[in-house]
Design a protein with these regions (language model features):
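N-terminal Rossmann NAD(P)H-binding glycine-rich loop of SDR-like oxidoreductase domains
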Residues: 16, 20, 24
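Active-site helix of classical SDR
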Residues: 112, 146-147
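C-terminal helical subdomain
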Residues: 170, 178, 182-224
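Active-site loop of short-chain dehydrogenase/reductase
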Residues: 72-73, 119-131, 163-167
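Rossmann-fold cofactor-recognition segment
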Residues: 47-60
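A short, exposed helix-loop element centered on a Lys and neighboring polar residues
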Residues: 112-113, 155
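Conserved mid-core segment of classical short-chain dehydrogenase/reductases
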Residues: 83-98
Length: 236
């Protein structure tokens, strides 16, 4: 199912910066009539087509209020996400681990649940679920686990949404140059590269976009022996 942005109404979660901000910019550039730019505390925008809207993906009442306020939405960019300084599943603070899952998994799924009837009522439309190469490689603890869980949920949601004529695209990528990756010394894609790949894929009707070589390699690694992905586990 190809998706046309011409005169579409788009809602972006986590829109204050990073990938979210770029999704807002590119949706408008592709012809969207309106973009709801959501965040816990939404920023001001200098474009009248952008509507700042409060949305905390960890708060059910906030999600429901946003779904009611943005009842003309036809495309949802499910982008909000968090990480934590110590996300070790063995030693990380349990409250912090739960916070990561509340945003990256439960919050993201809650957004789809709340907006699915809205998108259906507006002609079917689409969701873009922003995942990570870490959906398939445990480079971190809680963050990787939360993204793996969300990837699995998106696969289930995709089948359910398709029955109502709604498309779901999953986006995977390695490191992206955003505030979340500040201080990480590794090759990174730009937000422009990742969002362009995602929206090109959505317009083409793709189910999944692997936006860089890191994501491609991570998915291929799922079918490889465990030792190939995690060399420290290799036995002499």
């Amino acid at each position: 199912m190809s998706i046309d942005f011409s005169n579409a109404v788009v809602l972006v979660t986590g829109a204050n910066g990073g990938l979210g901000q770029e999704f807002v910019r590119q949706a408008l550039a592709r012809g969207a009539a309106k973009v709801y730019a959501t965040a816990r505390t939404p920023r001001a925008w200098d474009d009248s087509r952008v509507v700042p809207l409060a949305l905390d993906v960890t708060d059910a009442a906030s999600i429901d209020a946003a779904a009611s306020a943005a009842g003309d939405t036809s495309i949802v960019i499910n982008n909000a996400g968090v990480t934590t300084a110590n996300d070790s599943l063995l030693t990380g603070d349990v409250a912090e681990l739960r916070r990561v899952f509340e945003t990256n998994f439960f919050g993201a799924v809650a957004v789809v649940r709340a907006f699915a009837p809205v998108v259906k009522a507006n002609g079917g439309g689409a969701f873009v679920d922003v995942h990570s190469a870490l959906s398939w490689w445990a480079g971190t603890g809680a963050y990787s686990a939360s993204k793996a869980a969300f990837w699995s949920a998106s696969n289930s949601l995709r089948v359910e949404l398709d029955r109502d004529g709604t498309h779901l695209l999953g986006l995977h990528m390695g490191y992206v140059d955003t505030p979340m990756t500040a201080g990480i010394d590794a090759p990174m894609s730009t937000v422009d590269q990742i969002v362009t790949a995602a929206l090109d894929g959505l317009e083409a009707g793709e189910y999944e976009v692997l936006a860089d070589d890191v994501a491609v390699g991570a998915k291929q690694g799922v079918s490889a022996p465990i030792e190939a992905a995690y060399p420290s586990l290799a036995r002499a």
